[in-house]
Amino acid sequence: MIDDESVPWIEKYRPKKLEDITQSQNLLDLFKNSTKKGEMTHFLFYGPPGTGKTSAILAMGREIFKEHFQNRVIEFNASDDRGINAVREKITNEAKKYVAEIKLEDGTIIPSYKIIILDEADSMTDEAQDALRVIIEQYSTATRFCFICNYITKITDAIKSRCSSVYFKKLSDECMVEKLNDISLKESMELPKNILHTIIDVSNGDMRKAIMLLQNFKYTYNFKKNLTKKLKDMTLLELKTILFMTKKSSITSTISEEDVYEISASITLDKAKGIIDDTIDCNNIVEVSNLSKKIIAMGFPIDNILTQLNKCILESNKLDVNQISKIIIYSGDILLKMKECGNEYIQLLNYLAYVNRVSKHFD
């Protein structure tokens, strides 16, 4: 039996039913109608990460197949096998398997098809997607496909034309706070609303990331809650945690927003604002370069730093609307280069140098 403590919270608290999914009612009604009739079409789910795309199709599978769910729903992560060979071998072998209609004792009919889920489908090559088009047509009676992606523009027209496209919008802060508060109470954590809002802020609206961060946050929460415990009553793990935490400059018994930023490997907005102010005040590229080196030495992931810097840019009173627009657009290119394995120091220097130039009306 798997220890409950070892189960990732994103799986432990994944919605099992359609009504538990936080999305628009029209979307849920569409899914419920499909499950009631058992006449599911091919789907293409797209939208920001952590908005319930995978949870929705899994919940639909449970509604349609009941106790036969495990045998009728097959998941593939397209980012692992993104080429045509994976399509020809793994996916084709599953798609061509025929399954029989089953009638349960209560009269419920389990339809004679299965569901293949292709997560991160936008990472598949165009060649692999073209091969899938043939498979969809050939085995549509035995298999229903559900493509899941963040960017629909990376899906070929051949796939899009054969699927019902459904957009999953970003979850509201209120919905995320309610969900995180529910989870924290179930895990015996009483967190104030400002902490939950900070978790949402550093997660950028990604519910999956927020729940993972909340799970990591539990160790800090338990440590601070037990600061008043006597040493003889502490477990070995708690003693090791104290040894690690006492290496820091200061420890308080209260949970703070700084704890959230530290656990998420993000800089605070105040620190980000200071970096933007220092960048604007730089007089030459040498000063910008030295500032970039100091930021790199902080040890935070650069994409996290850039995200926080952009938030401060949007609220800056030292830049006009035109300057802010230029910087935000330019930062998109920087983040793309980061995802394509660009050098962190060079891309950070590129970003800060551009902010400096724009602030002085040189660009």
UniProtKB/Swiss-Prot annotation:
GO terms for molecular function: ATP binding; ATP hydrolysis activity; DNA binding; DNA clamp loader activity. Keywords: ATP-binding, DNA replication, Nucleotide-binding. InterPro entries: AAA+_ATPase, ATPase_AAA_core, DNA_pol3_clamp-load_cplx_C, DNA_Rep/Repair_Clamp_Loader, P-loop_NTPase, Rep_factorC_C, RFC_lid. CDD domains: AAA (cd00009), HLD_clamp_RFC (cd18140). The keyword Nucleus does not apply. Belongs to the activator 1 small subunits family. RfcS subfamily. Gene3D superfamilies: 1.10.8.60, 1.20.272.10, P-loop containing nucleotide triphosphate hydrolases. Part of the RFC clamp loader complex which loads the PCNA sliding clamp onto DNA. The lineage of its organism: Viruses, Varidnaviria, Bamfordvirae, Nucleocytoviricota, Megaviricetes. Pfam families: AAA, RCF1-5-like_lid, Rep_fac_C. This is Putative replication factor C small subunit L510. ATP binds at residues 47-54. One of its GO terms (biological process) is DNA-templated DNA replication. It comes from Acanthamoeba polyphaga mimivirus. It comes from the Viruses.
